[in-house]
A protein has these predicted regions:
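Asp-box/BNR beta-propeller blade signature and adjacent active/binding-site loops
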Residues: 1-167
Length: 167
């Protein structure tokens, strides 16, 4: 087996006996793949189809069934003197087992980070994430009440269909 180095990693099924691991490594996203149920892995490579931004952020991957894989994380942007650059929560979709990201959709345009996803029993996609009411999270140590909350989005099962709202 080969070793995958990085932090804040997520793993998802991406087809029969195939797995992908998505890794935050500094400001960038890296991916590695296994074709034998996780016994061996490809060398991790930078995933240019996913956002890179200063400071980076944890993101989530989730199997959508078959070869479909979803990625959810902030797109990011410019920091300000009072706010970080973690905002614009995006959902990316890969019908090719995370080998390329063919569609993306803005889910939440304000402060967002640290999402996690799961498929519900009825096929809907659930996403829980940290959210805030401004463009980026407040960076000062004294923060007002409500500066951050947990939010949940439930997307319909049709989100995995090729043409659904990603066009």
């Amino acid at each position: 087996s080969s070793e995958v180095l990085g932090g804040e990693s997520q793993i998802a099924e991406c087809g029969e006996d195939r797995l992908t691991v998505n890794i935050r490594k500094g400001t960038d996203r890296y991916s590695s793949f296994s074709k034998d149920g996780g016994q061996t892995w490809t060398a991790a490579a930078k995933d240019g189809g996913l956002p890179s931004f200063e400071s980076g952020c944890h993101a989530s991957v989730c199997s959508g069934g078959g070869n479909m894989v979803f990625y959810c994380g902030p797109k990011g942007g410019a920091k300000s003197s009072t706010h970080d650059n973690r905002y614009e929560l995006m959902l990316y979709r890969s019908p090719t087992g995370a080998q390329g990201w063919t569609r993306s959709q803005l889910l939440y345009d304000l402060a967002a980070g640290y999402p996690d996803m799961t498929l519900l029993g009825d096929g809907r996609l659930a996403i829980v994430f940290e959210a805030g009411p401004e463009k980026g999270f407040i960076t000062r140590s004294s923060r007002p009440a409500g500066w951050m909350r947990l939010d949940v989005l439930i997307l319909p099962r049709e989100v995995a269909d090729y043409g659904y709202w990603f066009e």
